[in-house]
Amino acid sequence: TSPTHVVLAFAKAMEELEEEGGIPARSRRYRENNRLLISEMKKLGYDTYVGSDVQGPIITTFLFPENAGYGFAEMYAYIKERGYAIYPGKVTEAETFRIGNIGEIYKEDIEKLAQIISDFQKEHKAR
């Protein structure tokens, strides 16, 4: 039996890719998402783990601030409750977290996530 659900999902994904303008347009959106995410996160005090010369547009790793006054679990829960997800870092020598830049993610999503993180920071500084 052929995996019809897989074939149908692939066909739909290819249709959506074509509607967006193909690989060049999708790649451009991912790169723009990445640049905007890094810019917004830097405004909030988060630095990237790797330099821009090696940063790819798929997922971005940020350093978790050493003296933030809150933990990753608190920040994760706050963001998750508001409909977004971030991921714990997998780097052993530094405290990090990751944010994906691909999929159904657009400028407005990046801006909303940045606002949620900003609100979280304000609430935790007010404690």
Language-model features: locations:
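A generic structural signal for well-ordered coil/turn residues at beta-strand boundaries
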Residues: 4, 56, 80, 93-95
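Conserved PLP-binding catalytic core of the aspartate aminotransferase-like
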Residues: 47-78
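PLP-dependent enzyme catalytic core of the Aspartate aminotransferase-like
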Residues: 95-127
